[in-house]
Amino acid sequence: MARSSLFTFLCLAVFINGCLSQIEQQSPWEFQGSEVWQQHRYQSPRACRLENLRAQDPVRRAEAEAIFTEVWDQDNDEFQCAGVNMIRHTIRPKGLLLPGFSNAPKLIFVAQGFGIRGIAIPGCAETYQTDLRRSQSAGSAFKDQHQKIRPFREGDLLVVPAGVSHWMYNRGQSDLVLIVFADTRNVANQIDPYLRKFYLAGRPEQVERGVEEWERSSRKGSSGEKSGNIFSGFADEFLEEAFQIDGGLVRKLKGEDDERDRIVQVDEDFEVLLPEKDEEERSRGRYIESESESENGLEETICTLRLKQNIGRSVRADVFNPRGGRISTANYHTLPILRQVRLSAERGVLYSNAMVAPHYTVNSHSVMYATRGNARVQVVDNFGQSVFDGEVREGQVLMIPQNFVVIKRASDRGFEWIAFKTNDNAITNLLAGRVSQMRMLPLGVLSNMYRISREEAQRLKYGQQEMRVLSPGRSQGRRE
């Protein structure tokens, strides 16, 4: 009897192990060896020149029917070193971002507005379907089914894996502002360290190109010319056979007479399958409640993975100081899909004249975009030299390299930012305040490090009682 029970237990263990292995193999976004960060990023072919960092403004602006897009320079030394790309979309009401995919994973921060989006996950079913009985009773001859439509709002962090097509639509009455971060040195990108966008429709201008490539095109007289979508390069007869359509529809598919860009204005009603409003609100409530629950790895499949997390709400703060501000983070612990794309993010809010304690990121670069206000920022390199000491204003981007130490102090207007990290579990190491490097060192080590008395070492170690977000004023947070 004991042998039979042992045999049954072993068979069950083998079966469960096989099931788990199969689940892991089903995910096309899973990469092996996630513990070693360097294995997942291509190294820059040239040495990084980081002795003079600059707060970057967009270098180009392209306007279209329902949008204007601003692009930072891909050829910039700092962006090339980090292997990142930044874009800002401003989409007008009823603007539709046409479906497309890119060669690098992206994070999108919703800085303003709300809307809906669709993301076509390979191999997943079209779970939104027309009610045939209702359509027939209404006299409609059309039926539709598609993958899930996902709402988003201000403060959301959206994830778009490499090679996965997605679209977005502005449902609000005001502009929708999206901050787009692309990790072009991610292991998912097998081409080159430049962002390439592949569109399924329209004739979009390739504004993502770097300045060097743009200037080469200008000398050839092709700057500003629209390129085609991915179907425009195929022969008509191939497309006719592939889609079982006629030549007239093929020409529309290829966009031969279409002068629209990447985002178009929807004049008529935008019809997609969406849950009823009350059902959507109930679902949103369940989503908010379940968002903080722990994941066990079996509750989500690749087709139902959460692809967003709101990091703008104050109740989600990971660090909070009622006089200084707050910081919220999104990593693979809170949003499991980030483990697949190897990225994370941080949302920060500093009140007037508050400060972020000196710190560095252990295992990633940080690309900081200022969403509101301005701050004085200082960055120091491994030689103890200041590589940036200046103001970062709303709309600017500052790349902070891995292990470079940074301090931020907000102006009278306060300061807010979103920082994108090139690691799915970016680790911050503090140098002052609670849980900092100074607190971890013995007094004897501190006194000999700086040739100070034990009393001075005591003040240095325990003088700052706050953690990371510091209240305004030099005397704030000190022990009495």
Curated annotation (Swiss-Prot):
A GO molecular-function descriptor: nutrient reservoir activity
S-S bridge residues: 48-81, 124-303
Assembly description: Hexamer; each subunit is composed of an acidic and a basic chain derived from a single precursor and linked by a disulfide bond.
InterPro entries given in the database record: 11S_seedstore_CS, 11S_seedstore_pln, Cupin_1, RmlC-like_jellyroll, RmlC_Cupin_sf, Seed_Storage-Functional
Role according to the record: This is a seed storage protein.
Domain Cupin type-1: 51-251, 309-458
Modified residues (Pyrrolidone carboxylic acid): 22
Record-listed Mg(2+) binding positions: 408, 468
Annotated signal sequence range: 1-21
PANTHER family hit by this protein: LEGUMIN B (PTHR31189:SF48), OS03G0336100 PROTEIN-RELATED (PTHR31189)
Family to which this protein belongs: Belongs to the 11S seed storage protein (globulins) family.
Protein name per UniProt: 11S globulin subunit beta
SUPFAM superfamilies to which the protein is assigned, alphabetical: RmlC-like cupins
UniProt KW keywords: Disulfide bond, Magnesium, Metal-binding, Pyrrolidone carboxylic acid, Seed storage protein, Signal, Storage protein
